[in-house]
């Protein structure tokens, strides 16, 4: 697998994790505020990683 293929696979995986987290929150999946905060932080971190990956691929 070349670098472009690896980057595309990683971006797809990151996007899946981001969407799963957003769906979890959107459906009321957080049982309390600390879990909500943790999930928002996770989504923010995944979004940052995806942006960095896209910047590196340019």
Predicted segments, located by residue:
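Intrinsic-disorder/low-complexity detector
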Residues: 1-58
């Amino acid at each position: 697998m070349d670098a472009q293929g690896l980057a595309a696979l990683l971006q797809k995986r990151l996007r899946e994790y981001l969407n799963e987290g957003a769906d979890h929150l959107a459906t009321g999946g957080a049982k309390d505020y600390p879990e909500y905060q943790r999930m928002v932080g996770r989504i923010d971190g995944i979004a940052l990683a995806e942006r960095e990956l896209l910047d590196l691929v340019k």
